[in-house]
Amino acid sequence: MWPYFTKTHASSESRHLPAIALALVIFCTGCMSWSWADESSTAVKILVTYHSLSGNTERMAEAVAAGAKSVSGTQIVLKRVGQVTAEDLFSADAVVVGSPVYWSNMSGEVKAFFDNWQFKFGVFPEFKMKNKIGAAFTTGGQISSGKEMTMLTILAAMLGNQMIVVSGGGAFGASATTEGESPGVDDKELAEAKALGRRVADVAKLIKIGSLR
């Protein structure tokens, strides 16, 4: 009886093999679909915005954008502060703001941009910028012209909106000294700006992945 039982059992198993194979195909296809969906859903949008008269802050902004773009799954919007729309602002997962140093502070154009978050775009009382990533960069003529103070005022405005601020390139962000022995923006300063962009993109992706769990 034992050989007969073994043969019958094996025959029964063989009849179920097509069904098992089909189930495995469906399972694997489902896993692939979830993988594609996860990759799409974790794509992050990063707004890099700035004010620039001489072109120095604009060069830094372009480097920040390039650094962010080097991280996979990112969509970059690069605009001057006066061109940013409510859609640009509220659809972004991260906002990086750059300003030249004016009297040890952000420029009037950048200050007006932050004021417009409420007066033009209406961020309150819902705190529409809450948990978005924020970062700053700046340019100034001299070493002690107020670059750190300018970045801190930008970050303070972001913190007031319950954003998550990050640094990169330097302690408070990326900066460039545009006069003296190295006029304009040099390669080292552009590298710091790119590093800031990459850091913002990396953190924004981590936050977005965590929010989907």
Where are these regions (language model features)?
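N-terminal beta1-alpha1 ligand-phosphate binding loop
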Residues: 44-68
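Boundary at the C-terminal end of the N-terminal hydrophobic targeting segment
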Residues: 35-37
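Bacterial N-terminal signal peptides that target proteins for export
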Residues: 2-21
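Glycine-rich phosphate/pyrophosphate-binding loop and the adjoining helix
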Residues: 40, 166-213
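A short beta-strand-loop structural module common to alpha/beta enzyme folds
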Residues: 73-83
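Short helix-loop-beta junction
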Residues: 62-74, 159-160
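Helix-loop-strand module that forms the ligand-binding subsite of alpha/beta enzymes
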Residues: 82-168
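Bacterial N-terminal signal peptides
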Residues: 19-31
